[in-house]
Structures are given as C-alpha cells and as structure tokens.
C-alpha cells in the first residue's frame, strides 16, 4: 500500500455561514492541493468535506495519515465511528458526510492525528488560509 499524508482544514464565517475547505495530499515528493466551499455550512462540515474530497482523488487503496486541527474529525475516525455505525448514526450530526466518508474511505487504512491549529504547522496554515479564502469568496455582499 502506498503511504499518503493528507492535511485538511475547514472554515465557516459565522458557523453556520459561508464556508470553505482545503486539503493537501502528499505522496513522497508529490503534492496536490484542493479547495472549495459552500454558501451556508459549518466548520465541521467543511473539515469533513475537505477529507472526503481528498479521498475521492485516490485511485487505489492507501495507508493514510490524516493531519487535522479538528478534534471532532480525528476523534470520530479513531474512536466514535464504529459505535455510530452500530447505532445507525442515531443523534449524529453530519450523517450525510459521515456516510460519504465510509464510502470513499473503503479499502484505505486511515489514522487521524490531531494537530494544534494556528501553531505554525506549515501545511495546516496553508490549508487554513485556503479554506478562509474559499469561505470569503462565498460571502454575499449587498449593494
């Protein structure tokens, strides 16, 4: 299995409000950056959207280390998700995105590593800036 690193971040102005996401995929010395957003969303949804969109790019099963400043995403992947499935996602927020995650993560081995946000982690800072930029693009202005 190829070893891949994924760094992701999500942003929401207002939470909920205009949101953006960004992810960096790294395999050896190759990198791919993706970003996007939605007009009305939350930071947790954008963080998860970043991960799902990154996973969709991968063509074969990989061993993935995910780096995120979202304890919600890291804890869900490492701890909560199996139990959520057993309980049919009862009382779980963002069920649509978690079910999508289960689909796009099939075949992959994923370990999520929490990193402190805004703490000088280069890839996290890049994702944070891109996600904020994507969110700002979706702010509606009144004239």
Curated annotation (Swiss-Prot):
Binding site for Mg(2+) 1: 9, 47, 69
GO cellular component: cytoplasm
Keyword set, alphabetical order: Cytoplasm, Endonuclease, Hydrolase, Magnesium, Metal-binding, Nuclease
One Gene Ontology molecular-function label: magnesium ion binding
InterPro entries (alphabetical): RNase_H, RNaseH-like_sf, RNaseH_domain, RNaseH_sf, RNaseHI
Cofactor: Mg(2+)
UniProt-listed CDD domains: RNase_HI_prokaryote_like
Compartments, record wording: Cytoplasm
Matches recorded under Pfam families: RNase_H (PF00075)
Binding site residues for Mg(2+) 2: 9, 128
Signal peptide (from-to): none
Function of the molecule: Endonuclease that specifically degrades the RNA of RNA-DNA hybrids.
PANTHER family reported in the protein's UniProt record: RIBONUCLEASE H1 (PTHR10642:SF26)
Family, similarity comment: Belongs to the RNase H family.
NCBIfam families: PRK00203.1
Protein name per Swiss-Prot or TrEMBL: Ribonuclease HI
Organism: Helicobacter pylori (strain ATCC 700392 / 26695) (Campylobacter pylori)
Underlying gene: rnhA
């Amino acid at each position: 299995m190829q070893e891949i690193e994924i760094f992701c971040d999500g942003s929401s102005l207002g939470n909920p409000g205009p949101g953006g996401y960004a992810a960096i995929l790294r395999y050896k010395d190759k990198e791919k950056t993706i970003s996007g957003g939605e007009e009305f969303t939350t930071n947790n949804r954008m963080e998860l959207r970043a991960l799902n969109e990154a996973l969709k790019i991968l063509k074969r099963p990989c061993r993935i280390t995910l780096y995120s400043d979202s304890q919600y995403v890291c804890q869900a992947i490492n701890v909560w998700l199996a139990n959520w499935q057993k309980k049919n996602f009862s009382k779980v927020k963002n069920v649509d995105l978690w079910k999508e995650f289960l689909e796009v993560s099939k075949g992959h081995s994923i370990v999520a590593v929490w990193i402190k946000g805004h703490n000088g982690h280069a890839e996290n800072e890049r994702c944070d800036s891109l996600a904020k930029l994507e969110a700002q693009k979706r702010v509606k202005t009144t004239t």
